[in-house]
Amino acid sequence: MFLNTIQPAVGATHAGRRVGRGIGSGLGKTGGRGHKGQKSRSGGFHKVGFEGGQMPLQRRLPKRGFKSLTVSANAQLRLSELESIAVNEIDILVLKQAGLIASTVSNVKVIASGEISKAVALKGIKVTKGARAAIEDVGGKIEM
């Protein structure tokens, strides 16, 4: 079997619509377009969002906010999430492999939410004051 020989199963597809081939076909003369009007003409379709000259909805509503380019590059991590990692030396690569942060993230900050009971060594990861105190209390280290 090759990609260029694959075909749909028999009866799975409909025959193409043959328009303008006589009265008996059911789609003769006007070809299913009705009589007159913009939609009956060739090339007679307006652009998406066009409301016949009325000010379109997307222009009536005010512009609002913007899409931050940095939001996908930054991530927060709880102390309790560090507990679930089996490795003791933790850096950004380890967090990505554990699935705790997205692959697009380049900056991580550990926040003091939850509890930690095992000593971990953080490398290249920022921490808040509360998180730093909690990590160092259980014998952990933080390197930048």
Swiss-Prot record:
Q: Which GO biological process categories is it annotated with?
A: translation
Q: Name one GO cellular component term.
A: cytosolic large ribosomal subunit
Q: Which Gene3D superfamilies match?
A: 3.100.10.10
The record's Pfam families line, in alphabetical order, gives: Ribosomal_L27A
According to the UniProt entry, its GO molecular function terms are: rRNA binding; structural constituent of ribosome
Q: Where is this region: Disordered?
A: 20-49
Q: Which residues cross the membrane?
A: none
Coiled-coil stretches are none
* Segments of skewed composition (Gly residues): 21-31
For this UniProt record, give its keywords in alphabetical order, as a comma-separated list. Ribonucleoprotein, Ribosomal protein, RNA-binding, rRNA-binding
Q: Identify the NCBIfam families for this entry.
A: rplO_bact
What family does this belong to?
Belongs to the universal ribosomal protein uL15 family.
- List the PANTHER family hit by this protein, alphabetically: 50S RIBOSOMAL PROTEIN L15, LARGE RIBOSOMAL SUBUNIT PROTEIN UL15M
Function according to Swiss-Prot or TrEMBL: Binds to the 23S rRNA.
Q: How does it assemble?
A: Part of the 50S ribosomal subunit.
Alphabetized HAMAP family for the sequence: Ribosomal_uL15
Q: What is this protein called?
A: Large ribosomal subunit protein uL15
Species this chain originates from = Neisseria gonorrhoeae (strain ATCC 700825 / FA 1090)
